[in-house]
């Protein structure tokens, strides 16, 4: 299991475009990957789940991956978050 905390700095938070990129990144891995925000956990491979959280600027989220490729998944998600200016 691997996890990482992120502080969302993007003005628009995790809106449709970056949410889609995060879901696409997570979907490349076999691990179960969740996004935790305000006590709610959703499957990071589900665009509807991610969008339903309404993660805005200044939010603190935790992404957790469980499975054989968990470390690689967290590294790829971290890269996407940084590249897109989300965290």
Swiss-Prot record:
Its main location: cytoplasm. Phosphorylation on Ser-46 inhibits the phosphoryl transfer from enzyme I to HPr. Keywords: Cytoplasm, Phosphoprotein, Phosphotransferase system, Sugar transport, Transcription, Transcription regulation, Transport. Residues 2-87 form the HPr domain. The modification Phosphoserine is found at residue 46. One of its GO terms (biological process) is phosphoenolpyruvate-dependent sugar phosphotransferase system. GO terms for cellular component: cytoplasm. The active site is at 15 (pros-phosphohistidine intermediate). It comes from the Bacteria. PROSITE patterns: PTS_HPR_DOM, PTS_HPR_HIS, PTS_HPR_SER. The keyword Phosphoprotein applies. It is found in: Cytoplasm. It holds the Pfam family PTS-HPr. PANTHER family: PHOSPHOCARRIER PROTEIN HPR, PHOSPHOCARRIER PROTEIN NPR. General (non sugar-specific) component of the phosphoenolpyruvate-dependent sugar phosphotransferase system (sugar PTS). This major carbohydrate active-transport system catalyzes the phosphorylation of incoming sugar substrates concomitantly with their translocation across the cell membrane. The phosphoryl group from phosphoenolpyruvate (PEP) is transferred to the phosphoryl carrier protein HPr by enzyme I. Phospho-HPr then transfers it to the PTS EIIA domain. Belongs to the HPr family. This is Phosphocarrier protein HPr. It comes from Streptococcus mutans serotype c (strain ATCC 700610 / UA159).
């Amino acid at each position: 299991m691997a996890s990482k905390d992120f502080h969302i700095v993007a003005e628009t938070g995790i809106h449709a475009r970056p949410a889609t990129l995060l879901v696409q990144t997570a979907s490349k891995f076999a691990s179960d990957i969740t996004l935790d925000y305000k006590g709610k956990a959703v499957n990071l491979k589900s665009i509807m789940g991610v969008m339903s959280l309404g993660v805005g600027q200044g939010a603190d989220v935790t992404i957790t991956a469980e499975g054989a490729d968990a470390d690689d998944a967290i590294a790829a998600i971290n890269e996407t978050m940084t590249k897109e200016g989300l965290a």
